[in-house]
Amino acid sequence: MPNENAEDLSGQELKQKAKEVADASEAMLEKVVAGLNIQDTASTNAAGNEDAEQPDGAKNEASVSANASKQALLQAVSDAMASTRQMAKKFAFWSTQPVTKLDEQVTTNECIEPNKEISEIRALPYTLPGGFKWVTLDLNDANDLKELYTLLNENYVEDDDAMFRFDYQPEFLKWSLQPPGWKRDWHVGVRVEKSGKLVGFISAIPSKLKSYDKVLKVVDINFLCVHKKLRSKRVAPVLIREITRRVNLTGIFQAAYTAGVVLPTPVATCRYWHRSLNPKKLVDVRFSHLARNMTMQRTMKLYKLPDQPKTKGYRRITAKDMDKAHKLLEDYLKRFQLSPVFSKEEFRHWFTPKEGIIDCFVVADEKGNITDLTSYYCLPSSVMHHPVHKTVRAAYSFYNVSTKTPWLDLMNDALISARNVQMDVYNALDLMENKKYFAPLKFGAGDGNLQYYLYNWRCPSMQPEEIALILM
């Protein structure tokens, strides 16, 4: 009897081979090809020994099948070699930067390059390709802010299928780019000289970061964006060099950043999880799909939440709570290997509720002590090519602390709070202690990973549950 799983198993093997090949260097690829030739010869010899026992039709069928498998695998090798060349070109820039190498085994927690004297740092901006000029954006200027919003809205991160794109609202940009200590000089833009059109941007904000047992003065790098039509101009590497130069001139030589792609070299890789709050809309826009044997009515019932939070003492944070809540979070973050160190002023900035931007709730006991905290920021995504829905309103889990209220109760209340301000989905990374509530609260694993990186700092890699850093 024929094996019903033979075709599927073959496909899995091909995918596995292709993945192995894609991860290898070109030298290794040549070995793989050589190995294929050896295996092919061995297969031919084995087939020759069995020829006498097989009818001609079976021989021909086996030959066609073997050739098809060989061609498919050779195509996978060819595609992987092309991918490897592209990756090598992409990594050429990073090979010039103080970052850990992909094959480097790190056991220390230290800077890669020593800090420089200000006199050693390049005084003039880096040279842009012809036809472009540097600008420093003023986010308090309505025109500059609108231009930045438009650039990001039309050219920033979108999903692989080009169905959704982050829609950072102007007031969100001001909140995320103007924390305590922000510098206008770190809001770096690129314009076309003739038209003045904004076609590139990168930003930095000051921060303190704990890496294992050391606290670093760093910047968080974000919103690196180049207009789609200019991505062959190699503008992005110049933007990175220029923001590095400007930050170095202030005496800061380390940075943290995240990316959905793999670069040299992630400190950690986290995965997004999603909890439907408005399942009908999410299915309509193809953000999610109905599970097998599930109707829309059953799906809506599955994700239905109570009308109001249930935890006694659960309420939105107030100005009077700030110092106690700051101490609660400060103590909690010390448990993790990579975490921010917030000053009181920074805590007030990041956790004071702003409608449509950030929301924060605490649980207070009878004596007024703050025992628990939950927070999320609001980041809609534009829906591309849908006749009805133009936006998916997403809540992103920020920082959460549970000391008295069970995790499931606290986060269920957070879901209710987000649903009550018309959020469609609640997203969370599998860092800190978030995994504890994913399954019970009906979160589903997403297909996107987020890599964490440190610039000019090497340290041993970390598991997601050792990470307590959220970058927008």
UniProtKB/Swiss-Prot annotation:
Enzyme Commission identifier(s): 2.3.1.97
Designated name of the protein: Glycylpeptide N-tetradecanoyltransferase
Disulfide bridge positions per record: none
Reaction(s) the record says it catalyses: N-terminal glycyl-[protein] + tetradecanoyl-CoA = N-tetradecanoylglycyl-[protein] + CoA + H(+)
The keyword GTP-binding is assigned to this record: no
Effect of inactivating the gene: Mutant embryos show disrupted actin cytoskeleton and abnormal cell morphology. The range of phenotypes includes head involution failure, dorsal closure, and germ-band retraction, as well as widespread ectopic apoptosis.
Taxonomic classification: Eukaryota, Metazoa, Ecdysozoa, Arthropoda, Hexapoda
Compartments (UniProt record): Membrane
